[in-house]
Amino acid sequence: MVTRCAEKIKPVLTYIRKALIAALLLHCDETGTRVEGKTRWVHNASNERYTYLTLNSKRGYAAMEEADILPYFTGTVVHDCWNPYWKFDNAAHQLCCAHLLRELNGVIENHSDQTWAEKFRALLLKMKKAKDRAIEKKKTELSYSSVHRYKNQYDELISLAYSENPAPVTEESKRGKKKRGKVLCLIDRLKKYKGQVCLFLENFSIPFDNNQAERDIRNIKVKTKVSGCFRSFDGAVEYLNIMSYIGTAHKHGINSFRAVLFAVWGKPYAFGVGTE
């Protein structure tokens, strides 16, 4: 029945993929799973209305290309700063600030001398609160002066961070650059991607975090933890196709059992178009 269901929903998956390409906002994430005793990667592309999961032996750019959404997407993609996402420069990018908060918490807990990290965490939360309050008041944007003030504070804290973490000096007798630690790499990232960290503050349609993608991929993590692995690659693909369909059904207020039943009957829900 699994194979039959997976076969019947193929046209719907094509529609979901096209709907995500045409969307203004896309959440992306990836997680490892076990297939035939080997590590394989589940890639998620989703938003509040659609879920699309694919399987690949690779985690990076090639796998994202094969998923066939990001190469054509021109809206805003939210992600955790995994380097291959930046190669898709046809889209705008928003970094997951919840992920950044976790990294900052790690710095705070493990490096008591890093005063900038606590202040930077407070700034991100202050920015989020300012946006949330504005939305509660039915506003569609923050004032230019407010955004400018937060960005200035951002720059000041980056300067403080560098003052507390001077770049390592390479001895003249040794070749190459000296390796930068995790803290300095985080600071470099925050400086380089300031625009992609703060985008949510300037555009209220863009979220602060990537929780949507994390929710949509959570079932895969649970299945991997409980069941161990998939027996075959084709079986894993069928499972992900069905989970894409069920996840999308749930977002449209459709009961999972009903959605699968209609698919097996050869009448899968074609979301946004009606029932085929």
Residue ranges and their predicted role:
Residues 1-276:
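Catalytic center-proximal scaffold of phosphoryl-transfer enzymes
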